[in-house]
Amino acid sequence: MEERKQKVVVVGAGPVGSLAALYAANRGHDVEIYELRGDLRDPSTTPLNFTRSINLALSERGLNAMRHANQPRLIDYVKGVTIPMRGRMIHGKRPDGKLYEEAQDYDIHGRSILAIDRGDLNKRLLDMLEEMPNVTFFFNHKLTGADFKRNKAWFENKDESTSNPRDRAREIEVDFDFMIGADGAHSAVRYHLMKFSRMDYQQEYIDTLWCEFQIAPSSSSAKSKFRISPNHLHIWPGKEFMFIAIPSNDGSFTCTLFAPAAIYEQLEEAGRTGDTSSSIPEFFDMHFPGVTSLIAPADLIAQFQTNPHLPLISIKCKPYHFSSSVVIVGDAAHAMVPFYGQGMNAGLEDVRILFDILDKHDRMTNDDSSLEASQRELALAEYSAVRVADAHAINDLALQNYIEMRSSVLSPVYRWRKALEEWLSVYVPSLGWQTKYSRVSFGNERYSEVVKKSERQGQVLLRSLVGGVGLPMLAGGLFLWFRYKGALGRAAYGVFYNCMGMVCRTIHGRRR
């Protein structure tokens, strides 16, 4: 659609910021992208989180956002570089000492999520933006100030270093019609937005650190370069920690150890003191059986000692905008822990929803610039109203999924509910029944609606279970009471009464 040209400033050149710039540029706006780091395509640039390889799970929401960017080459590229993961592969050890693998498909209909290298996707988006004449990059520029009432921002150019280290780099002033903040969890745009908007803000570091490891490609097999199945997200679950592995195109796997800070301290201390009984390989053999056959013990130690041990942050805030001048998206608005694989997907979806709402309000304007600004203000207010509830919902789901991944995947109750919901999805499709994971990862309905529907399904299953157990118990209790009215009958009725009480308390507790 043809729109009036505006100057859009995007702060942050990661995947979310780059997609936002692509959306804006496709609408004919003049786009300037400001990035704190150097060009992310330069190998010398320090990557996100100081790691070289971050594999992510790309699902329908992220793909849908890229489809709406009207860049068929982008979708073709994604199809060519991603690896489909159809489910989880749970690793463990049986009581007899034998190792096992157990596949758990994500979806009974055979749908998959895609493993993709974050850096490669980012580079591709930047390459596409560089081809557009109305896009300009400003790398090594730090946002130092903003006046969102006057639509002005100030950036420090770190490229122009001074001879005196105490002197500040040169600062430039930038005018804009509209700013999009996509500069991550520690967002400078959000920091300055708080000075203009009465923003509610909540930040939490969970008691879990993460460290990256690598499983190298196979050099001995002529059939496959992958040493374990490439079409699964591999999980070594533990009650308090877990180890995961995600495939890469070169045959390697990017692995992550998630564990409480106390565990990391113990392993670090063992490394310093040379305590072999609690060393890193012994820890892996005890809790993640089979990993030391995929990563040599010496490599495990080296990677643990070399790669950073990083925290996980969860952020909620509202609103996401001020007036008609600024909005935040992605981690700047809702940083979440990575356990649902939705962080990047939610950020990319932010962009699609934001521009859908902007387009809707743009159709209500004419050439009057003041009317244009007022409509954009209404659009940003609508975006905040719509998106906050969904962002908070997926933020909570991500925290809950950590428990599922590290322990519930082994639970018979978890497997029973998943199997029953999938059976209903296939054999009684008129009910519209789906697992929560399928709704989140393979659909585009609002996260908040997914939560509501999943809770309703859980209540129905619980009532059905209670009905299936409780009615036979009631019939049995009445039979015993009338058949044996003496002491035996009273004793049997007492057992029945207590059991029914437990069922009722279970229902009451679940509803709360």
UniProtKB/Swiss-Prot annotation:
Q: What class of enzyme is it?
A: oxidoreductase
- GO annotations under biological process? 'de novo' NAD biosynthetic process from L-tryptophan; anthranilate metabolic process; kynurenine metabolic process; L-tryptophan catabolic process; quinolinate biosynthetic process
Keyword NADP assigned to the entry: answer is yes
Q: Which GO terms describe its cellular component?
A: mitochondrial outer membrane
- EC code: 1.14.13.9
Q: What does this protein do?
A: Catalyzes the hydroxylation of L-kynurenine (L-Kyn) to form 3-hydroxy-L-kynurenine (L-3OHKyn). Required for synthesis of quinolinic acid.
Record family assignment: Belongs to the aromatic-ring hydroxylase family. KMO subfamily.
- The protein's name is Kynurenine 3-monooxygenase
